Amino acid sequence: MKNTRLFMFAACTLFLAACGRQTVKIMTPPDASNRVLFGAEQLQTTLDKAGYQVMMQQGDTTFSDPEIKTILLTEVNDTTLKKEGFHISTTGNLTRVSGRDGSGVIYGCRELIDRVNDSDGKLNFPEELKDGPEMVLRGACVGLQKMTYLPGHGVYEYPYTPESFPWFYDKEQWIKYLDMLVANRMNSLYLWNGHPFASLVKLEDYPFALEVDEETFKMNEEMFSFLTEEADKRGIFVIQMFYNIILSKPFAEHYGLKTQDRNRPITPLIADYTRKSIAAFIEKYPNVGLLVCLGEAMCTVEDDVEWFTKTIIPGVKDGLQALGRTDEPPLLLRAHDTDCKLVMDAALPLYKNLYTMHKYNGESLTTYEPRGPWSKIHTDLSSLGSIHISNVHILANLEPFRWGSPDFVQKAVTAMHNVHGANALHLYPQASYWDWPYTADKLPNNERKFQLDRDWIWYQTWGRYAWNCHRDRTDEMGYWDHQLGKFYGTSDENASNIRVAYEESGEIAPKLLRRFGITEGNRQTLLLGMFMSQLVNPYKYTIYPGFYESCGPEGEKLIEYVEKEWKKQPHVGEMPLDIVAQVIEHGDKAVAAIDKAAGSVSSNKDEFARLQNDMHCYREFAYAFNLKVKAAKLVLDYQWGKEIKNLEEAIPLMEQSLEHYRKLVELTDEHYLYANSMQTAQRRIPIGGDDGKNKTWKELLVHYEKELENFKANLALLKEKQNGNAVTETVEIAAWTPANVKLISNYPTVKVDEGISLFMDVPGKIEAVAPELKGMKALRFNGNEQREKGTSITFETDAPVKLLVAYFKDDQKKYAKAPKLEIDASANDYGQAEPVLTNAVRINGMPLANVHAYSFPAGKHTLMLPKGYLQVLGFTAAETKVRNAGLAGDEETMDWLFY
């Protein structure tokens, strides 16, 4: 058969040579690996498209015809080359591509392919070139997750089915994706899912745990085999990610358990199920790695250590033992929601081949100058000596506009090496992670745009600099000008304007979030804007700890800046007013550059028009934000100086900001389906995104217009009060009425009031309490039991109620941790994410407490609360108006002006 193919190739060669096509011969050894053959195939395809007649010769590698351009592909045991490295040498008509391994041959072929493509088909091969990657792992992820919850399921719970993920079963789409990874010299593919095992393996002891039907299960087996085989021949390592502790829904229902509960203890049943799931997966898919997230459904570091060392690692070892393997495949551990170094210290004696992963700038892209406590996590992990992976995660602040700044990416990857000590890259999609494979672009006839088509420059920039970030800036500008010129059908000189637009616009979202954001996480969608209340009193919205200290250069929040101005104190670092001035300059330059390029674009014109529109969107957003910040500065000036004119001068700035925001609405309304792809209750800033609401600029405009109306009305009242014309009313705050519930848990109760004790073994008594809480029927607890076991409450109610839980404002381990969406995606499942009363309870000898309300429908419920001291102040059906109860003192804030 092989001889027949060679004869046919030869015959075709003679025929086409007569037609004037230059012949190129590609030779591979008789024992060539699948990766070498794949490299040859890719090279053949490129040369064929460039107009060459390609002869493929496997077996005899003798250079016998000096008149024919010949390329010889071989693997060599050359220790001067890095793993995946290659050596290209050209003498006369013979070009040798020698790879340290099969992947090295592939990347050597890609080098030749790039040179052919970048030179209009010329065979300008290097006389001598050695190259290899700087980062050991260079990969991208795909989420088997969706924008909203599946009915009856919790966060991250998405079985692998054609109904939920039709694209997962599309082999052509996977081939395109894998080829994209190869083209960008990436060698790893991560699949993210909450609990994939119940879609991919069957367990003899728990046959009912399978979450998909038999037909789907067989499809999943076939797809996983296909995917891993296709990935392997491209030198790509497939890695399956999973969260802990999540159970399959049928397994949980069989035993009367929840699929996930952050605050429940580890039990033998849950551990056994998970260990056997992992063992079965390792045995069935031996070439697939595992990425372990010890969260978000586990609470304490002690549990994390126990779970990783006594369940996960033993499960991996069980699977290896069943295969008779003695090696240790890589096991990757995320630092998210755990003390990764502590876990690693406990795990390394048990399992050596451990990798670590931590988010680069949290869940956004904010800086190429990372620092602070989050950088220390990186350096602590990279100092362990294992491979440490920098995770460019979610990109919440870049959704949904196009982003692709080569300069920013090169500097960011350099920081990964030099600041964090990372030697591997994990890359999320640029936007719309939760809507993969589609973008947020609105197209005619309800068509959808694919991320791979739109965001090609995102993958190409990160892939290029993960391979080598030490490239000359001038050379790089020329490289990207040429790439953009090819894509848009214009000259390199004109394409430089497109690159400038990308690089100027690429600074806007990072700078604004790091100086004004509440969080870098999914909780905030920056490009929808922010409310004035969030700018003048950000602390009310719970700034994520470590964010400002880690995700940008040293600098000041607006509220800090104004305070220092009034106190005549020296400023430090990046200033908020400088940043908003810079972003409008970036916006102006981006628009000027992209508009200048528009006239000569001849290819991908529709995509260019959308890119051009995005640049205009960025500019309008920057102007709207700039004016709003200036208005917020005046409001904060009033807080210190009590000059009404400051508030009056804020109004025209807010009005001008709205004018730019209305232009943004016009630019986005027919171009985008949404801003944020996570469309659940986890989205809180600028406003709650429950049930897919408040996801467009048109929806937000109504809220921002109302904000201005409220401000004008409150300013008028303030003026009347100042002029002595207002009637002063004394507002008496009524106590909330306790609700009637059947408390099944056996806890004693007590009426809330000053002087009573809420703990049976802690001496402190209530010194002060918010009036809303007086008379509530609180539960009394043994504090030591709370610290050891957590708090579990079972009750039954005939009507909807709210359970009031008070968390102490202290990060000591003995106090239970308040809900935090950045590390616990279930932290708003009961509407409990934000406190309804802040500074509401003061107990002698303990910190102040904030009160959170957990909402429940009628029925029987069990709520597990975290380990540590907390108070359960009872049940109510009353409307719980959010306010600061003020027990910390009369701290005046200005956010009330906007309500």
Regions from the PLM with identified roles:
Residues 816-883:
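Contiguous ligand/interfacial binding patches
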Residues 55-82:
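Short, well-ordered secondary-structure micro-motifs within conserved domains or adaptor modules
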Residues 17-18:
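C-terminal motif of bacterial Sec signal peptides marking the signal peptidase cleavage site
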Residues 783-785, 790-802, 852-861:
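Extracellular and analogous surface-interaction loops
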Residues 727-787, 890-899:
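Glycan-recognition and processing domains
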Residues 187, 221, 226, 232, ...:
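Catalytic-core regions of glycoside hydrolase
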Residues 154, 429, 450-693, 711-725:
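C-terminal non-catalytic alpha-helical accessory regions
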Residues 23-25, 31, 39-42, 46, ...:
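Feature activates predominantly on carbohydrate-active enzymes
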